[in-house]
UniProtKB/Swiss-Prot annotation:
Gene3D superfamilies given in the database record: Preprotein translocase SecE subunit
SUPFAM superfamilies given in the database record: Preprotein translocase SecE subunit
Membrane-traversing stretches: 37-57
Name of this chain's protein: Protein translocase subunit SecE
Quaternary context: Component of the Sec protein translocase complex. Heterotrimer consisting of SecY (alpha), SecG (beta) and SecE (gamma) subunits. The heterotrimers can form oligomers, although 1 heterotrimer is thought to be able to translocate proteins. Interacts with the ribosome. May interact with SecDF, and other proteins may be involved.
Lineage start: Archaea, Thermoproteota, Thermoprotei, Sulfolobales, Sulfolobaceae
Chief localisation class: membrane
Domain of life, source organism: Archaea
UniProt-listed InterPro entries: Prot_translocase_SecE_dom_sf, Translocase_Sec61-g, Translocase_SecE/Sec61-g
Keyword field: Cell membrane, Membrane, Protein transport, Translocation, Transmembrane, Transmembrane helix, Transport
Example GO biological process: protein targeting
């Protein structure tokens, strides 16, 4: 398969994905953003606790 054929197929795939995809509703988008921020905060807190624990144990 040539490079030009691959690019053509890739472009067709992108068109198909865009035609099938739909824009999320405002409520769904807000919920996804809140959930993402919550998970990031939890991971950050866990990382801080681990770092603090290691620092106190090594000090």
């Amino acid at each position: 398969m040539s490079l030009s054929q691959r690019l053509k197929n890739l472009r067709e795939d992108w068109k198909r994905i865009i035609s099938v995809a739909k824009k999320p509703e405002k409520d769904t988008l807000n919920q996804s953003i809140k959930l993402t921020l919550l998970v990031m905060a939890i991971v950050g807190i866990i990382a801080y606790i681990i770092q603090l624990t290691v620092a106190l144990l090594l000090h």
